[in-house]
Each structure stands twice: as structure tokens, then as C-alpha cells.
Amino acid sequence: MKIVSPVLLGLSLAVVGSSFAAAQDTQSPQTQNPQMQNQQMQSMKMQSMQMQGPPKVLQITREFIKPGKSGAIHDKSESNFVQAMAKAKWPTHYVAMNSLSGKLRALYITGYASFDAWEKDNAAIDKNKALSAELDKDSVTDGELLDGIDQAVLYYDPDLSYRPPTSLANVRFMEISVVKIKPGHRKDFSDAVKMVIDANKKGGTSSQWAVFELAYGGGDEYVFFSADKSMAEIDTGYAEDKKFRDALGDDGLKKLTELEQACVDSSDSELFQINPRQSYPPDDWVKADPNFWTPKAAMAPAEKPAVKPLPAAKMPPR
């Protein structure tokens, strides 16, 4: 029986990894002359490169996949969206990840520097008739593979985050922990997380995480994102638990347990694997690991050679 949730104890937070794609804070290219579009796209790329830390706003689309429709079947469907964005040279990127625990589902995460930047990106897509039409068509095809779909919008909380990096280029797995807070207990939750941060600092663990507050799409919840370059880093996280507990001490553990009981209504941790075939990564990720981010398309099965008819059997003489 767990007396303290793994979220607050940092069991699922000891990682070496990163947060999300840098976001854009200017309007995406619309129907303009090619020179104007190119200038605007270059400006947005420069701003993306200059942004440090996680984006302020995350827009997450969650797709629930029908049994038997995941894997290569869903990859092929999602690649249509990726190809459409690449053809339009769209400067807003997103990362896809598939569940390794819980219900079969996929997440598509896009980062923005602000809500205003998100609005401008949506408006620009609407004005790009060719891209809009292609995305609408692809949505119909993809919808046939899904059991359901929902969306959420998160807002970054730097005070509750701990050493959040800036790139997913070398990350392969994502641990996502959702903590639902009891009404009126935000202060207790903040105090608990800050205790966890201090204990990780004192214990010298490898922990890193980014925390986002659920802005739209649910209740009073916080989401922890912890990135892993490999599953070996998950092993490291559990192995470092003793460092964390020793740094916290018996009195600290007791206080943390009391805070958790006071403020946490429920918590859940799930593991996801990043899927490059369904992602539209920024150029710097691709340059960092081109073999991962530009996987070869699955080859179609080779055609079987035509079967030659067997010669007619000779009839014995009568």
C-alpha cells in the first residue's frame, strides 16, 4: 500500500529528458505572395529558436484507437496530416506519443508561446484553403480508426517545475502524471511539490519535470511531464528513491504525507512512447537525430510471383 503517491515522492519524476517543442508567438503564414510568406516563416523560426524553456500553452488532442486499428494502420493515417503540414511548410510543429499503459490511445501535443499565438495559428490555417481542405479530408479518414477523441489545454507553471529542459530531440518515452486537487487546497499542493523539489536538490537525484495546470478540458488538475531517453532512466528513477527519502528525512516524509492527504483527491501515472511517424517535429530535432525523426516508410509487401499453372497430367494409355 502506497502511503505517499509516486507523483509527490518523485518515483516517476527522476528522468533526464526534456519538455516540448518551442512555440511561436507571431502569426502563421497566410495567403500571401511567396516572398512575404518566406519572410514571415523565417521570422517565426528565429523566434522559436530563441525561446527558452517549455511553452506557456499546450494544446493536447487525445485519440482513443479502436482495437486492431493501431500500429502501422494508424501510422499511415496520421502520416497524411504530417505530409500536409510539411507540404505547406507550416512552422507550428507537434509531437505524437502512443500509450504503453492504460487504454489504447495517442496524444498529439502542440506548444504555443501564448493563447494569442494559438489563435493566430488557427486563423492562418483557416485562411490556407488548400491545407484546411487536406486536413479536413484526413480527419474523415482517421476518424474511422477511432473510438473517441477529446482535447485539453494546459498552462505552464514554472514554480512547480524542476530543471525543465527545452527539447524532445533525444527523448523516446514520456511519463505523464495527472494529479487532481481537492477544492481549496492549491497552497497545500504547491507546498508539497516544493518539498519534493528541495529533497531532489539535496539528494542529488537526476529528476527533471515540467508541470502544467489544466486550463480547459477538466477540473482542478495538474499534469507532470517527465521525459526519458530510454527505459533505463525509469530504472534510475526508482533506484534513486532512497536518495530522495534520505534527503527528505522521517519528519519531512511525515509532513509530505500529511500534505498529500490534505490536498490530493486522486493521481494517476501513465507511460507513453514517442512516435516519430505520427509527429511533425521541428528542424532542430530532425538534425539532432535524423534516423529517429525521419523513419523510412514501411515497405509494401513484395508482390508474389505469378503461379505458373502445372502441366496437365498425362493420361495413361487405354
Feature names for model-found ranges:
Residues 1-9:
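Bacterial N-terminal signal peptides that target proteins for export
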Residues 8-18:
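Bacterial N-terminal signal peptides
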Residues 23-318:
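Short S/T/G/P-rich N-terminal loop/turn motif that feeds into the first structured element of a domain
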